[in-house]
């Protein structure tokens, strides 16, 4: 009956499965560290065709290219008339990384299943629930699309074989 066409359709789509697995991934962009304008480093000898030497007056022997030369600090780092030199040095030496979190950093949070004696509350991230709903919606949509396409294929096969009666 309809099992032979469906079996042929499944076997014919096997070659798609290998490409759906994905290929080998090389080095990710996040793992690469390259000096750039943000690092205050330039290589003027490459673009200008000017031979650049290091502090000893010789070319870099390992690459036979001009070494990276630090430039002046960007204009954002230069002190302005409104700030003192002391404030600038303090800002320059202090690096603070602020991360966006879903939990308050000022209050202690407790486990949601334990007694909450201090009256502290725990905040949760509403975006986690949104991600789960989105994932479930995508899965349901893909399953419905597969069923819809399968139904169209079955109707077309029946029409071709002459067993279609509306």
Swiss-Prot record:
Listed Polar residues bias regions: 94-103
Domain of life of the source: Eukaryota
Any GO MF annotation of the entry: chemokine binding
Gene behind this protein: Pdpn
A GO CC term attached to the entry: plasma membrane
Start and end residues of each stretch annotated as Requires for dimerization and lipid rafts association: 137-141
Name recorded for this polypeptide: Podoplanin
Tissue: In adult kidney, expressed on the urinary surface and foot processes of podocytes and in parietal epithelial cells of Bowman's capsule where it is localized to luminal surfaces. In lung, expressed exclusively on luminal surfaces of type I alveolar epithelial cells and pleural mesothelial cells. Not expressed in type II alveolar cells. In bone, expressed in osteocytes and osteoblasts. In spleen, liver, stomach and intestine, expressed in mesoepithelium. Also expressed in thymic epithelial cells, choroid plexus and leptomeninges.
Keyword Glycoprotein listed: yes
Topology feature Extracellular, residues: 23-135
Topology term for the membrane: Single-pass type I membrane protein
Subcellular location: Membrane; Cell projection, Lamellipodium membrane; Cell projection, Filopodium membrane; Cell projection, Microvillus membrane
Region named Disordered: 54-124
Glycosylated position list: 34, 52, 55-56, 62-63, 71, 80-81, 83-84, 94-96, 101, 105, 109-110
Additional detail: Down-regulated in puromycin aminonucleoside nephrosis (PAN).
Protein family according to the UniProt entry: Belongs to the podoplanin family.
Organism: Rattus norvegicus (Rat)
Domain comment in the entry: The cytoplasmic domain controls FRC elongation but is dispensable for contraction. The cytoplasmic domain is essential for recruitment to invadopodia and ECM degradation.
Any one Gene Ontology BP term: lymphangiogenesis
One Pfam family here: Podoplanin
Segments on the Cytoplasmic face: 157-166
Signal peptide: 1-22
Keyword Glycosyltransferase on entry: no
Transmembrane segments: 136-156
Basic and acidic residues: bias regions: 54-63, 84-93, 104-114
Keywords: Cell junction, Cell membrane, Cell projection, Cell shape, Developmental protein, Glycoprotein, Membrane, Sialic acid, Signal, Transmembrane, Transmembrane helix
């Amino acid at each position: 009956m309809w099992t032979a066409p469906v079996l042929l359709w499944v076997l014919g789509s096997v070659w798609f499965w290998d490409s759906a697995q994905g290929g080998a991934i090389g080095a990710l962009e996040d793992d690469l560290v390259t000096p750039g304008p943000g690092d205050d480093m330039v290589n003027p000898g490459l673009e200008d065709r000017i031979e650049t030497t290091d502090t000893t007056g010789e070319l870099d022997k390992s690459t036979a290219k001009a070494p990276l030369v630090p430039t002046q600090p960007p204009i954002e780092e230069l002190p302005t008339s409104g700030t003192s030199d002391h404030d600038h040095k303090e800002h320059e030496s202090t690096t603070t990384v602020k991360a966006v979190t879903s939990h308050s950093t000022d209050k202690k949070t407790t486990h949601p299943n334990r007694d909450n004696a201090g009256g502290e509350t725990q905040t949760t991230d509403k975006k986690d629930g949104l991600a789960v709903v989105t994932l479930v919606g995508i899965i349901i949509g893909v399953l419905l699309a597969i069923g819809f396409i399968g139904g169209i294929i079955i109707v077309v096969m029946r029409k071709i074989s002459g067993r279609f009666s509306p």
